[in-house]
């Protein structure tokens, strides 16, 4: 996962620049992607400026469900699911690292392979909203 870490480091400056701009302009912001490494600095800066910030890692614990989701995604992408299926070990290693980082950072961790878990996203948003109101 070293190349994943390198890519996270490379995009980090752009992520912080996007956050700074949104704070200056007072606009809402949703940042998502596999190259956003769970990090409390991202959330802390947003909260210090009076905003609501929530870090969430979405994962799929069951590998067969994960593969099925990748195949389903192919309908909406120009990329073949084979590209992802052939790299499933690497993808799951990256996912495992992200899940491990939620334990350090306190980010929410939701298994989207489970319908009940996916419903928890609203719960986490409500908790964050209520913490400042």
Where do the model's predicted regions map?
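A glycine- and Lys/Arg-enriched "phosphate-lid" helix/loop adjacent to the NTP-binding pocket
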Residues: 51-97
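Short, surface-exposed basic-aromatic patches at helix termini and helix-loop junctions that form
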Residues: 43-51, 124-128
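Amphipathic alpha-helical transducer elements in NTP-driven molecular machines
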Residues: 5-16, 85-88, 92-99
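Hydrophobic helix-cap positions at the C-terminus of alpha-helices
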Residues: 18-22, 46, 102
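Conserved nucleotide-binding/hydrolysis micro-motifs of P-loop NTPases
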Residues: 35-38, 59-66, 115-117
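Short glycine-/polar-rich loops that comprise or flank the Walker A/P-loop
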Residues: 49-54, 105-107
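NTP-dependent small-molecule kinase module
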Residues: 96-133
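Conserved nucleotide-sensing/catalytic segment adjacent to the nucleotide-binding pocket
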Residues: 1-31
